[in-house]
Amino acid sequence: MNYTDKLIELLDMENPAIKAMGEVTGDKLVSYFRDRKNPVYLFSISDAEKLKDDEILADAEKVMNHDIFGHKFNGPIDWKFNPTVETSRDNEWSWSLFRTIYWQPLARAYALTKDERYTREFLAEMHSFREAWPADEFLKDFTFVPKQPFPGTAWRTIETGIRVYTTWLPVFEIFRHSDVWTPEDLSSFILGLRDHALFLMGHYSNHDRSSNWLSMETSALLQIAIMFPELKESKEWFDTAYGRVMHEVRFCFSDNGIHMEKTPIYHMVASIAFAQALVMCRKNGIYVPDYAWEVIRRSALYICSLIKPDLSTPMIGDADRDDLTTRRADTSIYEGMNLSFFPEDLNELRAYMKWMYELFGDKEFLYFATLRKEGEAPKTNDYKFSEEGVYVMRSGWDEKADYLCTHSTQLELGERSTHSHNDSMHAEVTLKGEDILVDSGRYIYRSSVWKDWRAYFCSALAHNTLYVDNHELGEIKGVDRRRNVRCLCHFFGEKDGLKIIDLSHNGYAYLPDPVFPRRKLIMVPGSVVVLVDYVDGPGKENHDFRLSYNFNTTDVKLSDMHIDYVSKNGVPFELDFVSDVPFTSRLLIGSEDPKGGWISYGYPVREPAGQVSMAYGGKAPFIAATIVKSKGDGASVRIEGKGVVIESDKGRWIITREGAERI
C-alpha cells in the first residue's frame, strides 16, 4: 500500500501551509512536519531534554529488547499474545500493551541522546501495531465495544484515547525532529492517527462505561483535530470534540472539583486528560470558558486535600498508592496510573502538581511539587466533602502529623460502580506520620478470571468498617454494578478539644432484618484516634457482625481484644477494642482460605499484611469502641451505659449519640 498517496488525497489543499507547498510530495511533507511551528503542542523537545533520570536509557533498552510489562518477547512483539493466559487470564495486560505507553522511554531516550536507534524502534513498533490491528473492520462496526475473544481488542475507545494523548502525539513531538522518517513512515503514522479520530467519532461511551473513558476519548479527539488541521476532516472532528470537552469537563466533576467516580487515580486521569485539551486550546488561540479552568484547579486542590503525611495518596476505591517522593508515582506492573506524558519528570503526581502551579499559581501546588521545600502548605487541615462522601482531618501538614480519612463513596444514580468499593465509613488512620489502618488497595479487575479476588478487595472486609451477613454494602437484589449506599454526616468539626466525624449509612437497609450503622471517628489530642460504632436495627434476628482492621505490615499480634502493631518504619502502636456485647477476635496474615490479610499497592501485586476481625453473632443494637495509640500511651476507652468514656493525659470526655462533652 502506498500510504503517501492516500495521505495526500486526504489533505486540505486550501490549508495555507499545504497550499504553500505547491505540488505536494512525500519528501515535502516530511520536511514540513519536521519543521512546522504551528499548531503548538503541549511541550517541545527542548523540555524533554531537561529530564534528569539515571535509569531512562535502561528503560528504553528494555523496550528495544521487547521486554514489556514483565514479559520478554522472543523476537518481534506479538500483539495478540497475553502471558497471563495460564494464570489470571487478565485482559488488562493486553489492553496495557495496546496503549503503547512503553514508547515513552524510547522518545525520552531520543530526546537526551539523539540516537536514531530509538526512532527506528518506535517506527518499527508503530508499523507492527498497525499491521496487527488494522482499524478498518472496527470503523465499520458501530457496536460500542466490539466483542473479541481473550485477550481482547486494541480498538476499545479507552485504549484509542489513551494511545493518542499519552504516546502517539507526545512521542511524535519528540521524534518528528529525527532524520530517519521516510514519507511512508510519516504517512502511515498520520493515517494511523486519522483511524483513531474516525473511531472516536463513531464510538463514544457517553457515560455508558466508567466516566473516565469519555475524558480520554474527548480529549484525544480534540487534540488530533487541533494538531492536524492539514487533514480535510479535522474541522468536523474539532466541532464534535470541542463541544464534548467543554460540556463534560463540567458535567464529570462536582462543585468541589471531584470526579464522579470518586477515586484518586481515575480523578487524576480525567483531570489530566481535560487539562491537556484546555491547555492545547489556549496555546492555539481557542477559547476556553472560565468554568473549565476552575474545575481543573479545584480538581487539583482535591488531590492536595487527600495527601498523607508521607506524601502519598490514600487508596480510595480502585487506586494504587501514589507517592510524590519516588521516581514513579505508582508501582503497578501494568494498568498503572501512567496515563500522561510530562517531559521533565517521570513521577506523574509530582509533575501534575508542578503543572497546576504553573497554570494557577496556588502555592500549595508548589509545596507538594517540591516535597515541602517551597510554596506554602494548605491553609486548611480538615476537609468535608459530603456530596462525594469523603472526609479528612489532620493535625498539620508535616511528615509527623496525625491523619484521619473516612469515605463512603457516593456515586450519582446510574453511574456504574466500576471503580468504587464497598467502603462506607472506612477509617484510614495515621499517627505521628506512621500508617496504621489502611485501605487494602485494588489488586486486580474483574476482566481477569480471579473474580473472587476482585470481590474480596472491593468488599467491606478489605476496609476498616462493618461487614454484616456476607451482604455487600448497598446490595439490592436484581441491581448490578450500582453503588447504592448513601452516607449522612451528622457532625464534622471540633467539640471540646476533640475533632469528630459523625456518619451513618443505609448500606444494610435491605437485609431481612435491617441493620443501621453509625460511626464517630474521633481525633484525640496527643496522637490518639477513637472509633465509636453504634449498630442499631429492629433486632429480630441474629447476624454475623464483623469489624475489620487492615494493617500494612505483617508485624501484627493479637491477644483477645488487644492488638500490637509495628509500622513499616519500626514504630510500635497498639489498639484496644471494647463492646457491650461479646466479640471474638481473629488474625489473618496472607490467608487464601478464608481470604484476608492482604494489601495491594499496585496492580496486579498483592502481599501479606495483618488483618484483625472482631466478630459478634447476635442481635442489634450494640456499641463498640476502638482506641488507636502509640505503644505504652496511657489513653483508654471504656463503655459506661450508653456512653463511651475516653481518658488520656489531655483530658476526659464522654461520647454519646448526641455529641461529646469534656468531663
Indicate where each model-derived feature is located.
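Extreme N-terminal leader/anchor segments
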Residues: M1-V63
